[in-house]
């Protein structure tokens, strides 16, 4: 994403002229460059927004005027939106989301299945419709559906347990801020590149405290307050403080809710996830090569090496030495959402 945004930023400079925007990007990148990792687009966008708030009339920062900085910020926003709003004709014939949705549809439940996502795209919505699974996202109305806070807080205002809940806690490419009779509200429209979204920047925590985002985060809090709550996490790296606070506070307040965090990469020893997984017995952090279970860290090893469709979807054995039998060590694949969805699909198919 960062490389794509940088490419679009450099296009702002007219050919044959001094590269003002390119030079400004390089100055900003140098200013915000972290010591322990490469600069990402969140670092850049945060800095651009700080400069937009600080610049005065007639001033320049990094060689850009206030108007230039606004154009730079808009370019980053629209580039991010375009990347999460691909042409549906470019979708693969089968999305992994369809296996995920199919599993949801076949799962018996006492409560509605509630899916929380930070993604802006509409891939899950596309899969829900392809599989004809009834879903509710907090929007009501027929012509121009609008976000209804009551539908999240009052059970009688929402559909029954057969309807899957989809909560997009960072917004969506098909949301828009609309003004009706002098009052602003968020409505659901066709996907577009100016969606109502919390973009990656240092302002995202403050933005999450506004409606409808605060209502959606409150919903996550209430779900985790249930004694029998189980939250499976896939594709989230525990880098958002506002979401982490809700999850970790719930685990600390009660011992019965459980969180299973499927990670694409093994959490670093000093990461917030590894630190909390060592403390909370009701938090499992499962990486490719090792997992925290019951507060203890250990490498993966199958107790019994055998072939089964479900195991093969979830775990890849390390190759054995020539002439030797596999010892059971290997890689857990479920931190990859496509693999996780395929695993769930294997559970729903006849043996």
Can you describe what each PLM-predicted range is?
Residues 106-109, 159-162, 250-256:
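Short, conserved loop/helix-junction motifs that constitute active-site signature segments
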Residues 171, 177-201:
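Metal-dependent catalytic core segments for phosphate chemistry
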Residues 1, 124-127, 138, 175-179, ...:
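Short helix/loop capping segments that flank catalytic or ligand/cofactor-binding pockets
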Residues 1-126:
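Gly/serine-rich nucleotide phosphate-binding loop at the start of the catalytic core
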Residues 205-218, 238-240:
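A general structural motif
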Residues 120-123, 172-174, 237-239, 266-267:
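Short, solvent-exposed loop/turn segments at secondary-structure junctions
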Residues 1, 8, 156, 218-351:
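SIR2/sirtuin-family catalytic core signature
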Residues 12, 131-144, 235:
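A short alpha->loop->secondary-structure connector
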